[in-house]
């Protein structure tokens, strides 16, 4: 469990990489096929742009998370490896068609799209994102779509425009506990993120709402528990919890490696609050997103079947 109080990045990374963070890389034919399919379309993925440690695992399962609205972000968060720019390119009007072709080639039934923050656009990129989603609905009408969106700088109209596009899961990450947010996230606030999540839950009560946090940044156990309570109180249904891993020496250092037992503990805390928790050292927002979606759908179906008839 984590016990550091200071968020300042002055301490070095813990000396030893624990055994639970060592994994075999399942490279093979399927990985190569996924790699070729994505690169042939010239599509950025968060798997590559953010240096995700799960890329080989996911691509070996014919799954990937598409990065929409470019490969450079207008924010420079201390944990993220995506390139920063003050002058990003305009949204690509053909991006939806490219993602659809790639998703068809991979045989995706659950499509996950994340986005860079586009503070240069009036609606934060919501309209461009909706255009992509509408294209996917046309080209892959049976596929479900999960979107990991930015906070749109608190623009509720932009959020509602996105939610009206008929997505299966709305995901927006708080990323860390409230105390550490100013040191971890650029131009974002913990309370604004909670506000966006709560608004989504109230706007579409049947929508699956999702958020995620990283641990190992210097948070207290009590702060993680409070964050889970905050998410539950603001209408979130699914929460992912994973170990923060430093992409490079210019990023925020790791303060601690959280044990599998602690992840199990956080899972039990979240479940006691009614949350669906997916927690573990390698868990990321979109890691095994298709399986999480199916498990959540089965849980909701099971719960609804236990409810009394209204007649």
UniProtKB/Swiss-Prot annotation:
Keyword Metal-binding recorded: yes
Cofactor, free-text remark: Binds 2 [4Fe-4S] clusters per subunit. One cluster is coordinated with 3 cysteines and an exchangeable S-adenosyl-L-methionine.
Enzyme Commission number(s) from the entry: 2.8.1.8
Keywords: 4Fe-4S, Cytoplasm, Iron, Iron-sulfur, Metal-binding, S-adenosyl-L-methionine, Transferase
Nucleotide-binding found in the keyword field: no
Subcellular location field: Cytoplasm
GO CC aspect terms: cytoplasm
CDD domains: Radical_SAM
Pfam families hit by this protein: LIAS_N (PF16881), Radical_SAM (PF04055)
Family indicated by similarity: Belongs to the radical SAM superfamily. Lipoyl synthase family.
Name of this chain's protein: Lipoyl synthase
Lineage summary: Bacteria, Pseudomonadati, Chlamydiota, Chlamydiia, Chlamydiales
Gene (name only): lipA
